[in-house]
Amino acid sequence: ICNVLRKELWDEDVNSAVGLLSGLLKNISIDYTLVNDVGNNEFWMSRACVYAQVKNRTLYSKSFGALGNALGKAIGAYYATRKPVVAFVGDQGFQMNVQELQFIAQHRLPIAIVILNNESSGMIKDREAMAGYTYSLHTTKDSGYGIPDFSALAKAYGISWFRADSDFLLGGIIEPMMIELLIPDNQILTPSLPRGRDMQDLEPRLDNLKYNK
């Protein structure tokens, strides 16, 4: 039954963020190491890796919750393998350790930094809504959260910057680069598994006709 459901629901939870990441991943060399930060971006990336059938070595933090770890982890992954690295990070996590750009730029490390920019503290904003709050606190642009001009930041460090869409091709990585993916600020993390439920009983719930097919 699990295999039947997997086939039937293969793209059920492929939202725009997962779609963008999947397009990027399909062109990545198998020799590259992928690293992920913490937040909604990490879960979208997990789904995209399955959807795009990626076989690269991929490093996650999962429940350790070390927001902002991606750049430091990417540096370590490069020196461990001496091969290019692609780091996936949200706009908030990126700002937690942005000073690591100096080391990456100074040593011209072949690291591509992919920023999933939804101009918000996405996971915390989602949890505020799930908890029933009718307002946000420092998680959205109108409640105190802000981001810099990433293209200007890349220029300041002497790093190439690109804004990517679903047709963007990530070729050979021979020096630092920054790639910005624009994610809608209303893109929430789904599905989710509420505490105490069976693992197949996710939210939002599937149409019974589809689930019982």
Could you describe each region identified by the protein language model?
Residues 44-213:
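Thiamine diphosphate
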